[in-house]
């Protein structure tokens, strides 16, 4: 696996030279766990303001939190209801997480239902930091200490993005889903690289836990937001195969075997099917069918939640949603 030497990395390095020279010398002397504790503390400082005082920002947040509160009050952790109606919006996972948080921190305050988002985002920044470190150190001509500095810096920058600052203050699925998808992608990347290094999972069973963890995270993603996690995996898988074939000019699919497909499907089945079965039985199939027909299929057909716009809308919105990281785009 060859390394890449991209000019952009040198440019970014020159722009951050004051930071990396001063702060980097200090950081390098700290133990690794302390570095991540400092980053976590900074992330918390950036994210917590407003989590209690800001009222529900949209209709979905109020309905998610109310449904989770009802689940806790009714002690019914199978059927999702909003007032007297079945709520066929998203699988059960987010309601379990919010109900647990409300049980611990109190069910009356909207803050209790937002806390899982904050925790998920802290984990996300640490996982993303590990991702950046691995990529910078492995694929680019970056020294070990510089890779650590880049990874810590990206975690801090990630936590001050305007779009994320708004999103984590909403009791919805997106922050938790993003955390799970990031972990999923990091593990996928590691498995892929192990395959390229001719790592034989059948001879190194002590590392097979990583593959099982991948499927476990993917299954949790299904419980949080349905098909998004498997769709991300499928698109990533196809993209990597095509890149290997047409960019790397090789057709080596030995890494595909490392995913232990039979075990993976079993893990997904064991984690997701019990709730599907119980919910189907409790509602005579109404909850599951409404979720598939009324939510998932309608979104595909007509953009049920009106998340659409003219071509280029989301590119223009990046200047707002990804501020201030968008300042690095010219480089």
Name what the model sees in each region.
Residues 2-331:
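Membrane-integral, polyisoprenol-dependent glycosyltransferases
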């Amino acid at each position: 696996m060859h390394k890449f030497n991209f000019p952009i990395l040198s440019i970014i390095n020159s722009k951050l030279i004051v930071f990396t020279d001063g702060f980097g010398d200090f950081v390098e002397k700290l133990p690794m766990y302390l570095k991540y504790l400092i980053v976590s503390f900074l992330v918390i400082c950036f994210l917590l303001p407003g989590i209690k005082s800001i009222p529900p920002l949209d209709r979905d947040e109020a309905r998610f939190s109310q449904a989770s509160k009802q689940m806790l009050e009714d002690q019914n952790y199978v059927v999702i209801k909003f007032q007297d109606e079945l709520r066929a919006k998203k699988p059960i996972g987010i309601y379990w997480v919010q109900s647990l948080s409300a049980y611990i921190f109190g069910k009356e305050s909207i803050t209790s239902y937002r806390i899982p988002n904050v925790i998920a985002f802290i984990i996300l920044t640490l996982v993303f930091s590990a991702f950046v470190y691995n990529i910078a150190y492995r694929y680019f001509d970056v020294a070990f200490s510089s890779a650590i500095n880049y990874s810590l810096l990206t975690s801090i920058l990630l936590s001050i993005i305007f779009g994320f600052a708004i999103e984590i203050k909403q009791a919805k699925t997106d922050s938790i889903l993003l955390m799970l998808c990031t972990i999923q992608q990091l593990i996928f990347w590691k498995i892929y690289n192990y395959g390229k290094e001719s790592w034989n999972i059948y001879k190194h069973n002590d590392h097979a836990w990583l593959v099982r963890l991948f499927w476990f995270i993917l299954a949790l993603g299904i419980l949080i937001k349905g098909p998004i996690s498997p769709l991300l995996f499928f698109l990533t898988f196809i993209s990597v195969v095509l890149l290997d074939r047409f960019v790397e000019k090789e057709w080596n699919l030995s890494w595909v075997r490392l995913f232990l497909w039979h075990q993976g499907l079993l893990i997904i089945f064991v984690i997701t099917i019990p709730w599907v079965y119980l919910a189907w039985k409790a509602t005579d199939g109404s909850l599951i069918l409404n979720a598939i027909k009324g939510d998932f299929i309608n979104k595909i057909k007509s953009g049920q939640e009106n998340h659409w716009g003219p071509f280029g809308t989301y590119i223009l919105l990046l200047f707002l949603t990804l501020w201030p990281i968008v300042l690095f785009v010219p480089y």
